[in-house]
Amino acid sequence: MQAATVVINRRALRHNLQRLRELAPASKLVAVVKANAYGHGLLETARTLPDADAFGVARLEEALRLRAGGITQPILLLEGFFDAADLPTISAQCLHTAVHNQEQLAALEAVELAEPVTVWMKLDTGMHRLGVRPEEAEAFYQRLTHCKNVRQPVNIVSHFARADEPECGATEHQLDIFNAFCQGKPGQRSIAASGGILLWPQSHFDWARPGIILYGVSPLEHKPWGPDFGFQPVMSLTSSLIAVRDHKAGEPVGYGGTWVSERDTRLGVVAMGYGDGYPRAAPSGTPVLVNGREVPIVGRVAMDMICVDLGPNAQDNAGDPVVLWGEGLPVERIAEMTKVSAYELITRLTSRVAMKYID
């Protein structure tokens, strides 16, 4: 009997990379593997994608793990470097780095490096989080072009704030700012992440940066979901029934007695809970798959267990398989039911959840 286990489907991951190439055929792809590859395993994910043009990470430590694991493709530090003392390592490991503020620029100008580094100047086109403001961007760019520690030409990157809201006008405005600044400049350009790839083909440019969609999960809050775009879920969160019991009409279930059965039924208990990272906020009615059949969660999610209503005629037994999300049950459905984003669901699973890789 298997308790909480994440099953990672390498074949689906490779399929999704190919699907991204179909959607952005003129662009190279930075496969974003930050946050332990969105919960899928940093090194295993990168090794599964030898055809990725580059990888994107949030921390230098992630990049160094990839290099130590034999990954030779370009690796982009999406948030840049946090300490000037990291620059010699970035140079020696042939890493690419975003540069988005005056402190980073000054550090690049002051350091002595054996080899220059490849730089992506981050332009703030409307996210207002990281990046150089448009009115300061030209002077910043010129300093980078004259910096001996920067490999030329300087590349330009930005990030959409509302790519998943195609009617709001914000993305067009960001594109206008980005295009105006990039005009006539020789470096590579990148602004599209998952939402841009799916909804804004005019934003694909030289490089696109698929994140959550690489793993078969849509960045959109509502339908269409990943499978609707031709992607396959890479992660399946699975477990088993540890008990099946008769349950009488009128009896409550679990802490607080928040769910009371209206009929005699069969109740299943699943070895899964918020101690594994499953959302405690999941309400009664949230679906799971038992033996491939959709059944509802009933009562509160506990630390180690979830109860499900198997139905009065159920023939399920202890030890039978359960899928909490993944193949046959998109995680986007769970996100919609629980009001917890799919990003958070797949990245917050705890260390007691086993990981298994299949082809």
UniProtKB/Swiss-Prot annotation:
Pathway: Amino-acid biosynthesis; D-alanine biosynthesis; D-alanine from L-alanine: step 1/1; Cell wall biogenesis; peptidoglycan biosynthesis
Protein known as: Alanine racemase, biosynthetic
Cofactor(s) in the UniProt record: pyridoxal 5'-phosphate
Keyword Transmembrane helix on entry: no
Key words of the record: Cell shape, Cell wall biogenesis/degradation, Isomerase, Peptidoglycan synthesis, Pyridoxal phosphate
Function: Catalyzes the interconversion of L-alanine and D-alanine. Provides the D-alanine required for cell wall biosynthesis.
InterPro entries registered for this protein in UniProt: Ala_racemase (IPR000821), Ala_racemase/Decarboxylase_C (IPR009006), Ala_racemase_C (IPR011079), Ala_racemase_N (IPR001608), Ala_racemase_pyridoxalP-BS (IPR020622), PLP-binding_barrel (IPR029066)
Keyword Transport appears in the UniProt entry: no
PANTHER family, per the entry: ALANINE RACEMASE (PTHR30511), ALANINE RACEMASE, BIOSYNTHETIC (PTHR30511:SF4)
Molecular-function GO terms, alphabetical: alanine racemase activity; pyridoxal phosphate binding
EC class name: isomerase
Designated gene of the protein: alr
Residues where substrate binds: 129, 303
Domain of life: Bacteria
Quaternary structure annotation from Swiss-Prot or TrEMBL: Monomer.
